[in-house]
A protein has these predicted regions:
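Solvent-exposed beta-strand/loop surfaces, strongest in extracytoplasmic domains of secreted
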Residues: 1-224
């Protein structure tokens, strides 16, 4: 690029009547070219994924340096049509212009929290559900809502469903999660029988409620 001189010499066909003409010149200006920067619109990503070469992958038709904004490694908040920008500086600055701002749009989808909830150990009838059973965790802060709720006493039975819904604190970047389940077995309880040794009796005294007075912690029938 720059100002250049063009020259020409002319030889006439009819040299008998015409002289040659030498060194006729003109000036020409060669302007710098503007590089063609190509940058395909990146596919949507999920919140938590840092920007990298998959998204920041502009190319040009001449060698040079790309500077991206936001930079590689940035974690964008969730949202549609967020602007990514790149500036391009050509290596051959004598013949190419810089390209200050090429942009594309990217969508960042909300992330779905990862809920971890191991199946609880079996419990015995009469044990209320509590933190030992209702102990799901998530990879982001939030609130768990259990069904049945803490304090519930389940009837005995195998493979009973416990369910939890999770509402993240950061609703801008995370989805809610519903219907995560585990199974719990509630074993039958063994009644507690209380029966104090009766006082001595005399031979011939018939056994009665005075001696046959066992009690249990649940309703039922005693057979002596």
């Amino acid at each position: 690029a720059g100002n250049r001189t063009l020259s020409v010499n002319f030889v006439p066909t009819n040299t008998a009547n015409y002289n040659n003409v030498n060194n006729i010149t003109v000036q020409i200006t060669v302007n710098k070219a503007t590089p063609v920067v190509t940058w395909p619109t990146p596919v949507a990503i999920t919140y938590g994924a840092p920007l990298g070469v998959t998204q920041l992958n502009a190319s040009a038709n001449t060698a040079g340096t790309f500077v991206y904004s936001p930079a590689s490694g940035t974690v964008l908040n969730a949202g549609a049509n967020q602007t990514l920008s790149v500036s391009f500086t050509p290596t051959d600055a004598s013949n190419f212009n810089s390209v200050p701002a090429t942009t594309v749009q990217i969508t960042v989808n909300k992330a779905t929290p990862v809920i971890t909830w191991n199946a609880p150990a079996a419990i015995v009838y009469g044990t209320p559900l509590g933190a030992t059973q209702l102990n799901a965790t998530a990879n982001t802060p939030g609130t768990f809502t259990y069904t049945p709720a803490s304090g519930t006493i389940l009837n005995a039975g195998a493979n009973q469903v416990l369910s939890v819904n999770f509402a993240p604190s950061n609703t801008n970047n995370f989805n809610s999660v519903t219907g995560v389940t585990v199974l719990i077995t509630v074993n039958k309880a063994t009644p507690v029988i209380t029966w104090a040794n009766p006082s001595p009796i005399s031979y011939g005294t018939a056994l009665s409620a005075t001696q046959l007075n066992a009690t249990a912690n649940v309703a039922g029938t005693f057979t002596y």
